[in-house]
Amino acid sequence: MGRSMFRLLFRKMRHHLPQLTGMGLLVMVGTAFFVTLYTIYLSYDDHANRLFRNQHYADVTFYGSFDDNDVAAVTAHENIRLARGRFVRDFREGDVTLRAISLTDGVNTLYLYEGMIPAASDECAVISRHAQARGIELGDTILVDGRELRVTAIIASPEYVYLSQNERALMAEPDRFGVVYVAEGFFKSAYTEIVALGDISKEAADEIGEVIGAARTVVQDNQLNKVLFTSDLKQIRTCAYIFPLIFVLLIIMIVYVMTKRTITLERRQIGVCKAIGVAGGSLLFLYMAQTSFIAFLGAILGCVAAALLCDTIIGLFSTMFEVPGLAYVFYPALCGCVILAFMALGALSVLVSVRSMLK
């Protein structure tokens, strides 16, 4: 009986091949959409947070005019592990605005793509996106405030995952705006920022800011860079769910209509099968198995397509943000859950459409 049921199953699949093929393509596209976007979501979240962690992204930044005593006052707070003063200033060279930032040991450390961290006052490290846009390479010289600086490193920074100049220029053109990191000896004025690491609340940070006379105090979660990261992460996750839902609805509709029509046309065959002792459950399995099998094949192909497309999509996203090492990562649990979900969807769609007819 089992062998004959399987022969009947594949005979019915051949008979409904066009409809099943259409359903399989929808499953494949829906799976590819979801797995691609959700993989990017998981990979982006993982790599970006690793960058923030490993490069010691500042938990709080104080803006104003400070000296070493102010840095010491911040360091003395019980919830602050480390604090560093630094200089930040924008310089305009022709059509290009360069933001020069002094290096801070242990806070907002640089991720090196190539080269060495600047040590002398006539050296600098250039953020990668700006270097690529202007064709800057190691050993080149660039003008900052009329001074020639030799490029010793191409870098990424945890505070510039997004190349944002300010709140009015969230996505600055990389050939018009760049960030360079310089040795502290480049500047001769008071610190303009204090960056600190620590498990500190916004209220406690604001209190410290008042003590040192900061013009503005911003915790990490409110930094423009982190706000953009969090917002994009949520949007990618939302899109990962919204687009596949369209295909899910189409799949349900196709399976429902196809199965209803098939049951109507095969009512006599169903009656004969029941007359010779075939249980209604076995007949139900027959219709559920063909859609689940096609859903399984479509989901497998969708996962393969996602693996092929993911790096290309990440490359497109990389025009908006820069996270070192961001690439396709295979998540077995994700693919497994998607495959099972589409198989269950196919089976349930059949169950809803035929349960009353096979009683």
Segments from the language model and where they lie:
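Membrane-interface segments at the starts/ends of alpha-helical transmembrane spans
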Residues: L233, R237, P324-A333
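Helix-capping/transition residues at the boundaries of transmembrane alpha-helices
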Residues: L26, T264, C273-A275, G298, ...
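Interfacial "coupling" helices/loops that link adjacent transmembrane helices in transporter permeases
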Residues: H16, M253-F293
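Juxtamembrane alpha-helical signal-transduction segment immediately C-terminal to a transmembrane helix
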Residues: I40, D232, C239, V255, ...
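Hydrophobic alpha-helical transmembrane segments
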Residues: S189-I194, T238-I246, A275-F293, A333-K359
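Residue-level signature of the cytosolic catalytic core of signaling kinases
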Residues: M1-G2, Y328
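Small-residue-rich transmembrane alpha-helices
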Residues: Y256-K260, R268, S292-P324, P332-L358
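Membrane transport/envelope proteins' first extracytoplasmic loop
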Residues: G2-I252, G315, M320
